[in-house]
Amino acid sequence: MGMSSRTNPKVAVLMGGPSAEREVSLVSGRECAAALRGEGFEVVELDAGSDLCDRLRASAPDVVFNALHGRWGEDGCVQGLLEWLRIPYTSSGVLASALAMDKERSKEAYRAAGLPVAASQLADRAAIEAAHVMQPPYVVKPYNEGSSVGVYIVTEAANGPPVLAPDLPATLMVEEYVPGRELSTTVLGDRALNVTDIITDGWYDYHAKYSPGGSRHVIPADLPPEIFELCLDYALRAHKALGCRGLSRTDFRWDESRGAAGLFLLETNTQPGMTPTSLAPEQALAAGMSFGQLCAWMVEDASCDR
């Protein structure tokens, strides 16, 4: 089922929501709504709350542009609601969204597709705080959040295991830390667009991602041709392995000292940041597609049964 054939379809842009990434989603949603209006679409902005079903029925959009980030908006929940209401929507469907959001399950899919991932395990927070569950350096993070929310890096020089914030879940992912460069590739439809080298003063955390001057993006990344092509290949294969649709962004770490063997896939984001200076729109722009054109493409690509 595709979107309405109306020449000026009505688009509901979902944003905000209750997740830890609410503020980022509000920025993405407002930028996308403005861009879609500029492309001639009729737009209604919806801050997703417990009354979302009623508000969707009342606004009666032809298509939903999903600009939600994090849990509930990116993990298959809102996608299931939209399938039930039979409203065409952007980006990935229920299964791909749920799979990509679960870092452990997505790693199983990557391994099955022959994609390289860092060693990892799930562990109880009590065990993580009691002793090193992996030889440092390693990373501790929620297995079902994005935007580097709740991420801890335990260095080789650490005197002991980390003391975790009390609001983190009881089960967390512990992952081998891969030194080196942070790289990212966007997939649009069936094409991997480019590779961005993300340069920061330290870890690419929430602050570096969303604060002005927190990071610098080099596009195209200055990489050996083999590594550049591997990023494109791995991102497209990850997109397909998870069953993604529309737009996705896959992030990597590359340890230059190990050559091609040092490139590891971190995760695939089915709802990447959507402001004109976000990674995915930057790569689309480098491919000749403006931010407005990217948003319009996503609306035109929308469907149910994704």
From Swiss-Prot:
Its cofactor is Mg(2+); Mn(2+). The keyword Nucleus does not apply. Keywords: ATP-binding, Cell shape, Cell wall biogenesis/degradation, Cytoplasm, Ligase, Magnesium, Manganese, Metal-binding, Nucleotide-binding, Peptidoglycan synthesis. It is an enzyme of class 6 (ligase). ATP binds at residues 134-184. Mg(2+) 1 binds at D251, E267. Signal peptide: none annotated. PROSITE patterns: ATP_GRASP, DALA_DALA_LIGASE_1, DALA_DALA_LIGASE_2. It catalyses: 2 D-alanine + ATP = D-alanyl-D-alanine + ADP + phosphate + H(+). Belongs to the D-alanine--D-alanine ligase family. This is D-alanine--D-alanine ligase. It comes from Ruegeria pomeroyi (strain ATCC 700808 / DSM 15171 / DSS-3) (Silicibacter pomeroyi).
